[in-house]
Structures are given as C-alpha cells and as structure tokens.
C-alpha cells in the first residue's frame, strides 16, 4: 500500500498538516473550487519563483494565503511591489480580502516539488536524463537527506519505446508513517513528447512529542 499511494496524502493528519485549513457546511464545493482557482492562478503568476506549495486559511470574508517559495525576493518584489500586485489580482479573483504571507524555503534541494521542477526544466533544455537525476541526488544527500529516489519515464533520449529509469540513494521507507517523506511529480515537454518526473525525499523521522500535562514524574 505504501508503495502505491501518494506519500503526502497517506501522512496527512499523522505527521503532515492540511494545506487547506478551513471547513464549511454549505458552501464546501464552491469554496473548494475557489481554492483550486487560487492555486492555479498563483502557479501561473509565479512560474519562475520556485513555489513549493500554498496553504489557504479562511475566516469569514477573509483569505490568508501562505506561499512557500525558494525565491521570496521574486515574489515580494522591490519594496513589496510584486506582492501588492498579486494581492490586488487575488482580491479581484475571489471578491474577498486576501492576505499573503511569504515563507522562504531555506534548503531548496530537500523540497521534492522544487527538485522535480528543476529536473523537468533541465530535461526541456535537452540535458541528459541520467546526469540530472544523479546531480539532484548528490545535492540532496549533501544537504542531509536520509534518502532520495528519482524516476523519469517516457521516451528517454528520443527512444521509440517509452520506459522508466530510476535512481536512488539512502533509504526511503514508504510504509513508515512517522517517516517525513516529501513527494512530487512534474512534467517536461520535450520535442519527443512529455516526460514524467517523480521525486521522493526522506528527511528523517518525525516523532510525536510526549504529553506531560497529566502530571506524573
């Protein structure tokens, strides 16, 4: 089961938090579609800003958006000009008051989404699919990853028959729920068609904190 399921979805509510932090009785469907619209809009607007993921909180007529990015300067802009433009566009898109918080990702080579996107962009620039995977693995392990696995599938090197090639280093325990495993999928548009890129990064175990509020010694 751990081999097939999305590692992030399997761990939500155990060691990972939800990316949509709200609940609605009646308007759940419409608000969910609004969330999808916001996420798609941010991805399109900030294509070059290395956005990993977006968290959305709702309260009454207000939306709080946290953008996790490897390039916060590009999102904020000079004197906050870019983030102000983005806020105004989101206000118009949702017809609600939007507040944006930008959170910097310190180690971009330990973020699966950013690693997958980086591999995909290099493949589009005709880089060797073997070399880009090995380089990504080396960088992640140097930054302290416990394990990493990458896979590229499609018409590799322009071959007539599509296949998949994967490389890994360290351990990636997909069945262990306390294992902090980041996963992402990206696509590269090449002259031979699409290539799929998958990345799993094991960053160590997340142990539950002991609850000592009940007294005891």
Swiss-Prot record:
Example GO molecular function: rRNA binding
PROSITE patterns: KH_TYPE_2 (PS50823), RIBOSOMAL_S3 (PS00548)
Domain of life: Bacteria
SMART domains: KH
Alphabetized UniProt keyword annotations: Ribonucleoprotein, Ribosomal protein, RNA-binding, rRNA-binding
Coiled-coil region list: none
GO annotation terms (biological process): translation
Any one GO cellular component localisation term in the record: cytosolic small ribosomal subunit
InterPro entries, per the entry: KH_dom, KH_dom-like_a/b, KH_dom_type_2, KH_sf_prok-type, Ribosomal_S3_C_sf, Ribosomal_uS3_bac-typ, Ribosomal_uS3_C, Ribosomal_uS3_CS
Domain KH type-2: 38-106
Function: Binds the lower part of the 30S subunit head. Binds mRNA in the 70S ribosome, positioning it for translation.
Recorded family membership: Belongs to the universal ribosomal protein uS3 family.
Subunit structure: Part of the 30S ribosomal subunit. Forms a tight complex with proteins S10 and S14.
Protein name (database record): Small ribosomal subunit protein uS3
């Amino acid at each position: 089961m751990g081999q097939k399921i999305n590692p992030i979805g399997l761990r939500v509510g155990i060691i990972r938090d939800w990316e949509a932090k709200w609940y609605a009785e009646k308007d759940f469907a419409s608000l969910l579609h609004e969330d999808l619209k916001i996420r798609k809009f941010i991805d399109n607007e900030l294509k070059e800003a290395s956005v990993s993921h977006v968290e959305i909180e709702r309260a009454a007529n207000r939306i709080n958006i946290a953008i996790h990015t490897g390039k916060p300067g590009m999102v904020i802009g000079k004197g906050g000009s870019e983030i102000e433009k983005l806020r105004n566009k989101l206000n118009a898109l949702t017809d609600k008051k939007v507040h944006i918080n930008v959170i910097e990702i310190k180690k971009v080579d330990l973020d699966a989404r950013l690693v997958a996107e980086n591999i995909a962009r290099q493949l589009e620039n005709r880089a060797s699919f073997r070399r880009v995977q090995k380089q990504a693995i080396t960088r992640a392990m140097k930054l302290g990853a416990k394990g990493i696995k990458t896979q590229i599938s499609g018409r590799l090197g322009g071959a007539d028959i599509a296949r998949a090639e994967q490389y890994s280093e360290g351990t990636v325990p997909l069945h262990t729920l306390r294992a902090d495993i980041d996963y992402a999928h990206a696509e590269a548009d090449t002259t031979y068609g699409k290539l799929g890129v998958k990345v799993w990064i094991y960053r160590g175990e997340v142990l539950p904190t002991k609850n000592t509020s009940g007294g005891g010694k």
